[in-house]
């Protein structure tokens, strides 16, 4: 065999190998494209404390692996910290609102609890357990709790403080409901992918506080659906970042901005009017008309109030061809979210059937 023929043979083998590699790359690109089409990106948006992180936790419970005992144990410290944070917020508000303690000994309990560095809390034992129990039972603190719209207080306060005996027991393991109600402000971006009917739903939760919103921008590509959460109970509350701005007005302004973004022209919009349980409680003593004078419905009527709030948001949509899908939710209620998300999933799949070759 001549040198030329050996070289020609080597070259053709190299060319063959190059073509084989090229074909494999082409095949992989086609697979990637197909797989990307089978992934639906759901962007969870809304102002701070509207319930986005709780919604993601529910997806993990309903469509993922849920929370093992080991996972739940990881929330123990956070539950304790939430309890101290809530009581400290009320102790500070007692001063600001000039509410006296009914029982003199609670001044000492307040001093004790106030001195605690919440971020260092890792256990929950006496004298702190008794101090917090005594404080929570003081009529002054109860009055302060009833006036919580005048300062910042976690929605889970009553839930935890009414259950101190259980939480203070030795070997306490948080329940699923304890985990759902833990409040940890979201900083940065949390993604939760889960598989449903051979489609990957990638849910993206971004921080709702103003300082977090500038990080949203790069999440905006290829968004299938915007899931916007509004806390129905915020109609009489002020912002964490600015105590003279109404939280619901801020939520409306953000919603208006989001639905008019050019990035989202082809994304469906699903509006979750969340915390319906808190609205039902609050509407009995805090009147919607005091904060939204245009409301002309009956007082103490949760149904009328939530329909009015829904209309306020839907009316912000400038595009009459764009449908806004809406659901009233309670993000801490697993069965409610299971039911609502089944409907949402069907809506999203229906809207994307042809594009995703799922028919």
UniProtKB/Swiss-Prot annotation:
Domain of life: Eukaryota
Catalysis: reaction(s): GTP + H2O = GDP + phosphate + H(+)
Organism placement in taxonomy: Eukaryota, Metazoa, Chordata, Craniata, Vertebrata
Binding locations of Mg(2+): 53, 186
One term under GO cellular component: membrane
UniProt cross-references to InterPro entries, sorted A to Z: Gprotein_alpha_Q, Gprotein_alpha_su, GproteinA_insert, P-loop_NTPase
Localization terms from the record: Cell membrane; Golgi apparatus; Nucleus; Nucleus membrane
Region (G4 motif): 270-277
First-listed, main subcellular location of the protein, grouped into a coarse class: membrane
Full protein name: Guanine nucleotide-binding protein G(q) subunit alpha
EC number: 3.6.5.-
Natural source organism: Xenopus laevis (African clawed frog)
UniProt KW Lyase keyword: no
PTM text: Palmitoylated. Palmitoylation occurs in the Golgi and participates in the localization of GNAQ to the plasma membrane.
A molecular function (GO) term: GTP binding
Region (G2 motif): 178-186
PANTHER family for the chain: GTP-BINDING PROTEIN ALPHA SUBUNIT, GUANINE NUCLEOTIDE-BINDING PROTEIN G(Q) SUBUNIT ALPHA
Role noted for this protein: Guanine nucleotide-binding proteins (G proteins) function as transducers downstream of G protein-coupled receptors (GPCRs) in numerous signaling cascades. The alpha chain contains the guanine nucleotide binding site and alternates between an active, GTP-bound state and an inactive, GDP-bound state. Signaling by an activated GPCR promotes GDP release and GTP binding. The alpha subunit has a low GTPase activity that converts bound GTP to GDP, thereby terminating the signal. Both GDP release and GTP hydrolysis are modulated by numerous regulatory proteins.
């Amino acid at each position: 065999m001549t040198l030329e023929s050996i070289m020609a043979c080597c070259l053709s083998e190299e060319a063959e190998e190059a073509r084989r590699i090229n074909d494999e790359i082409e095949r992989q690109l086609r697979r990637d494209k197909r797989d990307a089409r089978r992934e639906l990106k759901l962007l969870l948006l809304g102002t701070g404390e509207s319930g986005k992180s709780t919604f993601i936790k529910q997806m993990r419970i309903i469509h993922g692996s849920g929370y093992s005992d080991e996972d739940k144990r990881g929330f123990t410290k956070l539950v304790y910290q939430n309890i101290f944070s809530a009581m400290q917020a009320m102790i500070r508000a007692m001063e600001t609102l000039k509410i006296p303690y009914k029982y003199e000994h609670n001044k000492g309990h307040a001093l004790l609890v106030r001195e605690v560095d919440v971020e260092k809390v890792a256990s929950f034992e006496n004298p702190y357990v008794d101090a917090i129990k005594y404080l929570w039972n003081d009529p002054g603190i109860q009055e302060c709790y009833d006036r919580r719209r005048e300062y910042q207080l976690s929605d889970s306060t009553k839930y935890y403080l009414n259950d101190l005996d259980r939480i203070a027991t030795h070997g306490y393991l948080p329940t699923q409901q304890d985990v759902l109600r833990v409040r940890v402000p979201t900083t940065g971006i949390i993604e939760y992918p889960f598989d449903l009917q051979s489609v990957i739903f990638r849910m993206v939760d971004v921080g709702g506080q103003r300082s977090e919103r500038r990080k949203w921008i790069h999440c905006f590509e290829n968004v299938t659906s915007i899931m916007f959460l509004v806390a129905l109970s915020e109609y009489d509350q002020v912002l964490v970042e600015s105590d003279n701005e109404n939280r619901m007005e801020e939520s409306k302004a953000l919603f208006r901005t989001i639905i008019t973004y050019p990035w989202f022209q082809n994304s469906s919009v699903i509006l979750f009017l969340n915390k319906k349980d808190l609205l039902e409680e609050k509407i009995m003593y805090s009147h919607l008309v005091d904060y939204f004078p245009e409301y002309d419905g009956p007082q103490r009527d949760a149904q009328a109030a939530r329909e009015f709030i829904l209309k306020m948001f839907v009316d912000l949509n400038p595009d009459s061809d764009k449908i806004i899908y809406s659901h009233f939710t309670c993000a801490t209620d697993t069965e409610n979210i299971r039911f609502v998300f089944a409907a949402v999933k069907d809506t999203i799949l229906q809207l994307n059937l042809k594009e995703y070759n799922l028919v």
